Amino acid sequence: MSIMNSDSVENTHNFAPLKNDRLLKALRFEPIDTTPVWMMRQAGRYLPEYKATRAEAGDFMSLCKDTARATEVTMQPLRRYELDAAILFSDILTIPDAMGLGLYFETGEGPKFKRTLRTEADFNQLEAFNAADSLSYVMDAVTSIRKELNGKVPLFGFSGSAWTLATYMIEGGSSKDYRYTKGLLYSKPEFLHQILDHITTAIIDYLDAQIVAGAQIVQLFDSWGGALAHRQFAEFSHKYNKRVVAELKQRHPEVPVVVFTKGGGLWLDVQMDSEADCLGLDWSMPLDKARAILATGKRKIAVQGNLDPATLYGSPELIRQSVNAMLDDAYAGGEKTGYIANLGHGITQWVDPKNAGVFVDAVHEYKL
């Protein structure tokens, strides 16, 4: 277990002082000059320079494991746009891959695993996981990116949530109905909890190692939490997200933690019951309503989101109007901080890069 405060991490790596702390201030509910903004999947296939670097690497995982190229693609959107954060270029499925399931990608079909995790025999064959060793290439990338940023903006580390990773590991890839995962949930819930507990321990180790390597914020992507029924969300997803956050807060109390549950807007009352600094929202939840719900809690929780990524297919005028409406909602309660502008999910490969710039600029041009 690593217990290092932020000063220890900064001094160990001799990182440059942070110049733009707008996003961190918003997370702390401190006054800000303008709304901080970044985009999920901001280093991605909508950028021609990303496509060129990925082609040089040969395939996606080779790109992730190449420190110099992973650093390069992380920096690319920051050269184009006035973003307020960088996010580590990697994939949420690095943990299952390191556990020996054999991650690979098929064109047009997304990620797949050579092995699945459906029986106790499968579980017993999982390889031992130690983030610093099993995923050393991720930590190398984190440190390299921090040095390349030179204090420009803070760096997000991230992981998939236990529930989301479990669905991939059990299904063997993406799924529309989560047949095998939900089959375990309703027929062998104790075994599914055993799997989730094991993955949660790995996630804590993984995010802890990213923080020690230089990540200044971490985000937990609960991409498929919204596939669960209400009571099952609390038991099979939130319970484990809460444990991740609590453990990270014990080890690194000064490092903000964001939890993003796609489709989780209905369960803000459940998600409030954690130490998360910020909750990410998709486009289905109005920001004014979300902030009003969170304001009833015992402590302040920031919000991140939540423009529909498809909005970026529209005209520049439409994008600006949509951003203004989103920020009107975000600040409707009168509090002009505690909010990070983002998309409601990752930016898609078909977006015109110019329109992504319109989005970022429109956020910064909004008068607080």
From Swiss-Prot:
Drop me one GO molecular function for this one. Answer: uroporphyrinogen decarboxylase activity
Record site: Transition state stabilizer: 91
Q: Where this protein primarily resides, as one coarse class?
A: cytoplasm
Pfam families under this entry?
Answer: URO-D
Its pathway, per UniProt, is:
Porphyrin-containing compound metabolism; protoporphyrin-IX biosynthesis; coproporphyrinogen-III from 5-aminolevulinate: step 4/4
The reaction(s) annotated as catalysed by this protein in its Swiss-Prot or TrEMBL entry are: uroporphyrinogen III + 4 H(+) = coproporphyrinogen III + 4 CO2
EC number(s) per UniProt? 4.1.1.37
One GO cellular component, as annotated: cytosol
Can the keyword Lyase be found in this entry's annotation?
A: yes
Q: Which SUPFAM superfamilies match?
A: UROD/MetE-like (SSF51726)
One of its GO biological process terms is:
protoporphyrinogen IX biosynthetic process from glutamate
Q: Which PROSITE patterns match?
A: UROD_1, UROD_2
User: What does the subunit section of this Swiss-Prot or TrEMBL entry state?
Assistant: Homodimer.
The UniProt similarity line reads: Belongs to the uroporphyrinogen decarboxylase family.
Q: Which NCBIfam families match?
A: hemE (TIGR01464)
What is the stated purpose of this protein?
A: Catalyzes the decarboxylation of four acetate groups of uroporphyrinogen-III to yield coproporphyrinogen-III.
HAMAP family for the chain: URO_D (MF_00218)
- Please give the name of this protein: Uroporphyrinogen decarboxylase
Annotated organism of origin: Psychrobacter sp. (strain PRwf-1)
State the taxonomy lineage. Answer: Bacteria, Pseudomonadati, Pseudomonadota, Gammaproteobacteria, Moraxellales
